[in-house]
Amino acid sequence: MTLEEEYRLSCYEELTTLGNHNHIYLVKHKLSGEIFVKKVLSRFSLDVYKQLRDLQIPGIPKIHDLILENNSLILIEDYIHGQTLEQLLAEQTTLVYSDALAIMRKLCDVLKSLHTLTPPIIHRDLKLSNIILTSENLVYIVDFD
């Protein structure tokens, strides 16, 4: 890791770990006060993350920084405030048809954006816990690791 990369990482204060993951942290940028997610990945495709960072696809959290350290990738991305589709279905057990259809259409739009890239990006682990719904009715796909 370069001195510049160390400095960039030092600008983030770790607040807490997210969920059961000891490699995903909620962090706060010390200067702006903005909240982000920091992930330390041991298995990753650097090309995929660079492509996601450079393209900023709607429905995918914006990646702000990528830093290689030893055999890990440290990733800083937007924190998406909302609940997973898994959480929503645990609370409601069923969805109104029109709501389910709207979620699926938005999800398909995000997947189409990923799959029509050259080269295409395939998530490979799409599940209810990797789909976040926001209070603004936006759909995000997370966890490309």
Segment roles from a protein language model:
Residues N20-F44:
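ATP-binding glycine-rich loop module of kinase domains
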Residues L85-L95:
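AlphaC helix of the protein kinase catalytic domain
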Residues N70-T84:
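Conserved short submotifs of the Hanks-type protein kinase catalytic core
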Residues I103-M104:
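Activation segment signature within eukaryotic-like protein kinase domains
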Residues L66:
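Activation-segment/catalytic-loop signature of the eukaryotic protein kinase fold
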Residues N130-I141:
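Conserved protein kinase catalytic/activation segment
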